[in-house]
Regions:
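N-terminal leader/auxiliary helical segments
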Residues: 1-197
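Acetyl-CoA-dependent GNAT
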Residues: 205-260
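Short hydrophobic/aromatic beta-strand or adjacent loop that forms the aromatic wall/cage
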Residues: 234-236, 337-344
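Conserved beta-strand segments that form the floor/walls of ligand-binding pockets within enzyme
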Residues: 238, 250, 264, 268, ...
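Conserved acetyl-CoA-binding loop-helix of GNAT-fold acetyltransferases
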Residues: 267-269, 275-292, 311-315
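Conserved GNAT acetyl-CoA-binding A-motif
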Residues: 290-301
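Conserved catalytic-core motifs of GNAT/GCN5-like acyltransferases
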Residues: 301, 319-335
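Conserved active-site alpha-helix within GNAT-family acetyltransferase domains
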Residues: 305-322
Length: 348
C-alpha cells in the first residue's frame, strides 16, 4: 500500500474538483483491518491483478464517486507495489517491512504538511456523515469512519522530514506517470461500460407532440444508421417558440466508442433566443424518446471551454464524469478540439 495521503494526492491528480465521496473512496480500501483480508480485497492473492481490476471497472458506474475512488485506490496500489514497493525490497538487506513502513510514514506526513489543500480535505472527510459512504469491500462504515478520524489526527500530530527513499520528487513522478496511465485505462473502461448498456432500436418512433407549453420540438429528420461509419440512428429536431425556429437539437440512439466523446445529444440555440434556458428545456423534452428506446443513461459532451453548454448540463442534473483528451482518430480532434467535458445524464 502507498499510504493514505499519497492516495489523496493521486485522487487530486485525477479529479482536482472531485466530490468528497470520491476522495473518501480513494482511501476506503485501507479500512480493512486484517492484512490477509486486505490482500484479498486488493487482489494481491491473484496471479493477474490487472484482469480483476478490469472486471471491477466494468461493474463500476462512472457516476458513482465513492466506487470510482475505490477503483482508483486499488489500481494505484497495484502499480505502487510494482513500481515502488518491489523496487524498495530489492535494495534492502534483511527485514524490509519495518524500514518500508517508516519511509511511507515520512512521505505521507511530509505530503500532508506541504500540500495546501490537505488539511481542509481531511477535515471535510471527517465531518461527512458516515451514512453517505458507499460500500467498502471487507470493511464497515464504522471502520472507515475510524480510519479517517485516526489518520486525520495522526497527520496533524506528526510533521516529519521527507523520506530519503520515497522523496517528494519520486512521489511527484509516480503520481504523474501512473495518473496519466490510469486516465487512459479508465477512459477505455468507461467506453466499454457505456457500450454494454441496453438500447432498443427497431425503428424510429413518432410522437404526437413534444412540448412543455413554452417551446416545442419539431422533427425535421430521422437519420438511419450508417454501420460502415459507425454512425447510429439519430433524430434531428427544430426547437420552436410560437411556431418560429429558436434552435436545433439532435438525439443519437445507441452506444459507440465515438459517442463517448461526441455525445448522444447535441444542441444549439439561435443567438436571438439565448438566455431563456431553451437548451435545457429541449433536452428534457427528449426524455420520452430516450426511454422508449430503452436507454437509461445518455452522454452529453461539450468543449471544456464552453461555459454555456456546461451550465446547461448542470441545470439538467447531469454528472460530470471527466474532462477527457480527444483521441486523434475522432472527428472532433480533426476539427481542432483537444478536450471534452463528458457528462452523464440519467433519465430513469
Amino acid at each position: 500500500m502507498a499510504g493514505l495521503m499519497l492516495h489523496l494526492l493521486m485522487a487530486h491528480k485525477i479529479k482536482p474538483k472531485g466530490g468528497i465521496l470520491f476522495y473518501i473512496g480513494s482511501i476506503a480500501p485501507d479500512a480493512v483491518a486484517n492484512w490477509k483480508d486486505k490482500d484479498i480485497t486488493h487482489f494481491r492473492n491473484l496471479t493477474d491483478r490487472s484482469e480483476a481490476l478490469e472486471n471491477l471497472a466494468l461493474q463500476t458506474s462512472p457516476s458513482d464517486d465513492f466506487a470510482e475512488g475505490v477503483l482508483l485506490h486499488l489500481y494505484m496500489d497495484w502499480r505502487w507495489d510494482t513500481l515502488a514497493r518491489d523496487e524498495f525490497i530489492k535494495k534492502i538487506d534483511g527485514d524490509w517491512f519495518i524500514k518500508y513502513r517508516k519511509e511511507l510514514s515520512l512521505s505521507n506526513s511530509y505530503a500532508f504538511h506541504n500540500t495546501d489543500w490537505a488539511k481542509n480535505l481531511w477535515e471535510q472527510m471527517e465531518l461527512l456523515d458516515s451514512s453517505e459512504y458507499g460500500k467498502t469491500p471487507g470493511a464497515t462504515v464504522e471502520e472507515l469512519k475510524d480510519l479517517i478520524c485516526r489518520n486525520n489526527k495522526w497527520h496533524n500530530d506528526n510533521n516529519m522530514e521527507p523520506s530519503t527513499y520515497f522523496t517528494p520528487e519520486f512521489i511527484e513522478k509516480f503520481i504523474n506517470q501512473v495518473g496519466d496511465e490510469y486516465t487512459q485505462w479508465k477512459i477505455q473502461r468507461e467506453i466499454e461500460y457505456y457500450n454494454s448498456l441496453p438500447v432498443d432500436f427497431v425503428d424510429f418512433i413518432d410522437f404526437e407532440k413534444l412540448s412543455d407549453g413554452e417551446i416545442e420540438l419539431f422533427c425535421v429528420a430521422k437519420k438511419p444508421a450508417i454501420p460502415e461509419k459507425k454512425w447510429v440512428p439519430a433524430y434531428d429536431f427544430e426547437i420552436r417558440k410560437n411556431n418560429n425556429r429558436a434552435g436545433r437539437i439532435n438525439l443519437r440512439i445507441g452506444y459507440t466508442d465515438g459517442l463517448y466523446y461526441g455525445g448522444h445529444i447535441g444542441y444549439s440555440v439561435d443567438e436571438q433566443h439565448r438566455g431563456h434556458g431553451y437548451a435545457e428545456k429541449a433536452c428534457r423534452l427528449l426524455t420520452p424518446i430516450i426511454k422508449a428506446h430503452g436507454m437509461k443513461k445518455v452522454l452529453i459532451t461539450n468543449n471544456h471551454t464552453n461555459i454555456a453548454s456546461k451550465r446547461t448540463c448542470e441545470k439538467l442534473g447531469a454528472k460530470l464524469i471527466r474532462i477527457a483528451p480527444i483521441p486523434e482518430w475522432h472527428d472532433l480532434y480533426k476539427d481542432g478540439q483537444r478536450f471534452e467535458n463528458i457528462f452523464e445524464w440519467s433519465v430513469d
